[in-house]
Amino acid sequence: MSKEKFERNKPHVNVGTIGHVDHGKTTLTAAITNVLAKHFGGKAFAFDQIDKAPEERERGITINTSHVEYDTATRHYAHVDCPGHADYVKNMITGAAQMDGAILVVAATDGPMPQTREHILLGRQVGVPYIIVFMNKCDMVDDEELLELVEMEVRELLSEYDFPGDDLPVVRGSALKALEGEAQWEEKILELAGHLDTYIPEPERAIDLPFLMPIEDVFSIAGRGTVVTGRVERGIVKVGEEVEIVGIKDTTKTTCTGVEMFRKLLDEGRAGENIGALLRGVKREDVERGQVLAKPGTIKPHTKFESEVYVLSKEEGGRHTPFFKGYRPQFYFRTTDVTGTIELPEGVEMVMPGDNIKMVVTLIAPIAMDDGLRFAIREGGRTVGAGVVAKVIA
């Protein structure tokens, strides 16, 4: 046993399997854990350990997801696999499983199928940055030309959705044979792991990104000024730095003159910490929950965007009836609700509970946002949907 296993200082990367039902996503997940456990240490998972995915609730939405982990020589991976198509849709939209990259599983015996396309589209919409293809069940196809054809089809499909279809890695393997321990197919799993290590760049850590903190509360402290509190989402704010207050009202600039945590004064607040930030020359009524504090120039307020939305089913506590164009719910971003109107795609008249749908949203007040921001759709405080900003429009 190499000492590799005990090092916990390896970069951590989040990945997952996507693709059509029965193309072998779960078998591949099991094969990866088994082959890598042999070579790099770690725990091997059996197919049925992964297949019995526990139910999770993310923003009131029921999602079945399996989480496994594995190591390569240079990295530690957390990997998600979902049993059902609906679980993928929910997972990707809510960001319950944020992926730094995805492994698209396509059976060589079938080629791309409807859910293959849908998962690629979802990946594009929700901002999965990298896709690696694993062509599965290649042991069942004798004809080299057929394999070429399937690979070409998959590459074209990925290009259609703006992934670099011509350049991304495609591995031809057999998850089942690898799981059964056949050396030539185990080799293919190692090849896949090599691509995970080299093709998916190391994710930027939250602390290295520009400072942003959603404002949860505003207090005025006699003789000191106005304090805003919240959990720092990313980056670092240092005492004496300029910050912007963005969203809802016109953007204003101020200076952070103090940072405190648990009543202790600090010289900076970092990603993940709950802090109070003292703002120079800001009146209590100038700031409100729902705005964000950010490094100047790094985020802008917007009112109109294209989104991908999952509408909760009745069983999940969602609506019992469909909604139509002209629907005006609240959109909950970070810490606050903003009313908005929706435009449905051409030819879509109504949206049923349990559907996922692309929609354009126009808010009545601007919110600090970038592509990839998650939100909830609410009616009178009850969550009826979850969404992600696919593309800011205005």
From Swiss-Prot:
Gene3D superfamilies: P-loop containing nucleotide triphosphate hydrolases, Translation factors. It comes from the Bacteria. Residues 174-176 are annotated as: G5. Residues 81-84 are annotated as: G3. It is found in: Cytoplasm. GTP binds at residues 19-26, 81-85, 136-139. Residues 19-26 are annotated as: G1. GO terms for cellular component: cytosol. Its EC number is 3.6.5.3. HAMAP family: EF_Tu_B. Belongs to the TRAFAC class translation factor GTPase superfamily. Classic translation factor GTPase family. EF-Tu/EF-1A subfamily. This is Elongation factor Tu. The gene is tuf1.
